[in-house]
């Protein structure tokens, strides 16, 4: 669960 990675989508 990486919120940073999700925000980079």
Swiss-Prot record:
Keywords in alphabetical order: Neuropeptide, Secreted
Protein location: Secreted
GO CC term (a single one): extracellular region
Similarity field: Belongs to the FARP (FMRF amide related peptide) family.
Any one of the GO BP annotations: neuropeptide signaling pathway
Function noted in UniProt: FMRFamides and FMRFamide-like peptides are neuropeptides.
Top-level taxon: Eukaryota
Designated name of the protein: Extended FMRFamide-2
